[in-house]
Amino acid sequence: MVQQPKHRKALLGTLALGLVLTAGILSSCLTGGGKAGAQPALILGIMPSVDYLPIAIASEHGFFDDSVELVRFSSPMERDAALQTGSVDGSITDYMSAMLLQSKGQELVLPLATQGSFRLAFGHNEDLMRLSDLEGKHIGLSSHTVIEYATEKALVSPKGKTLPFTPVEVQKVPIRLEMLRSGELDAAILPEPFATLAATKGLRVVSLPDGIIEHITGLAFLRKSYETKRPAVVSLIKGYNKAIAYMQETPREEWVGSIVQLLGIPPEVALQLQLPDYHPAASPDTTHFAPILEWMKTKKLVPQSYQATGLVPPLPDLQ
């Protein structure tokens, strides 16, 4: 059974951090440069997470040739709700969320793989040094998400069985971090920039075992938007590739402001932030769906007959 936190005194300690992290979320949208009005705008939902960084940089540097609007959200629930209602045309999401939406009848496609970054942070208990030390401990997570999936996959015995632990439901990542600092949690998987923030606060942060959470996010679109707003989709992908090339060829000091604006973190943290190895646009490898989908079926989140058929369409011709 997933435990609920007994109190919320950690919330006060999180307030300052939350204000910092949401500072860049207050504006409702940013518009990429280009032929405004030439085509219906492609509206993307974005969040303060490193997998959105190439899109944010492309928007700021005018790498989009067509109208691409970025609408900021502060939580995955808000983002996914906007996608479900058609308020946005697309957003980066994890494979699990995309498959869950498609299994419920959402006309969704996932044409582009993206790169995120997650690590596990320990609390202040100095006896906890390895993943195997977390047997029976209190682990913060959000149920039925890739975080719960990754937690179960990471905490395994030498024989491959999931180690028993006490899951504590903490959906908001800033609160999860503050509960680690206050001793209410023994460990939790955190996305960037929160893992780096945990390290700057003196918490021990470790990488997850290879393959568990390396290939789990992609850029999803409503199928209708992907098919009818093709010029803007092509512009988005070209701009995405230009942004990655720019990041690879330019010292981080020259674009650290984009990290600060997107993630709401101080420049000194942005400079040491562990960023993923960004790749130019490519389709998701559907073999990475299999372990996630198997886990989802075990949890009865999708029907046993569901196979994610048609979820990954071909990328458009960029010529």
Across the structure, where does each feature detected by a protein language model lie?
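Soluble non-cytosolic domains of exported or imported proteins
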Residues: 49, 77, 92, 141-146, ...
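Conserved C-terminal helix/tail region of periplasmic/extracytoplasmic solute-binding proteins
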Residues: 297-319
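Short, low-complexity disordered leader/linker segments with a strong preference
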Residues: 1-41, 319
